[in-house]
């Protein structure tokens, strides 16, 4: 069973008690793909399988599916790979009816070039979200309360920033921990963070390269958007970025249709 790690109080007196593993992980064993857990789209309850081997990202927004574990239906039949069954134009209703469908961001090739000779590519959900109606509180980022879309088990919830905007991952600092090159992960305060890769927002395919392993841990708080949403309509979710090649851990933001890891905290 999972144990808890409680952070030291920040300047606002806030603490978070984290599970010792990613949501869906079967173990905290270093180097085991069973420690990776599941991947989630921001604000969505439904999980997607992580990797069981390294995959390679292609340049044309399509992804290799090698390394994706086999998933079976109730009749013990192997289901198609998730990257091959991803759909566009997601809604809450569709996600409830089809929890195993990854709703990717739609790209449309216009065939028209811009002033620099590059093709103009449009997307239908210009926010970069997987769902047609975006909501900053799908995971309690505004209310700081557990919601019906929260995938964490009873007594736990998705971590969000506190009332003063402080991140729950401020305690994670590259120079305060140790990068484990052999097992491809980061350890600090006895807590193990494997690099899990992601499911790409454009396809639902896995992106996990052996040459540059990385991980993203979702935070239920929205990422900063542009002040001019009419011109730059992208909406984001915050996440903790863990990558060795840049020698850093930092809170960043990504499109909400991206599939990333998640680590629950005590309510």
Give the residues covered by each predicted segment.
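Short, compositionally biased
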Residues: 1-146, 223, 256-267
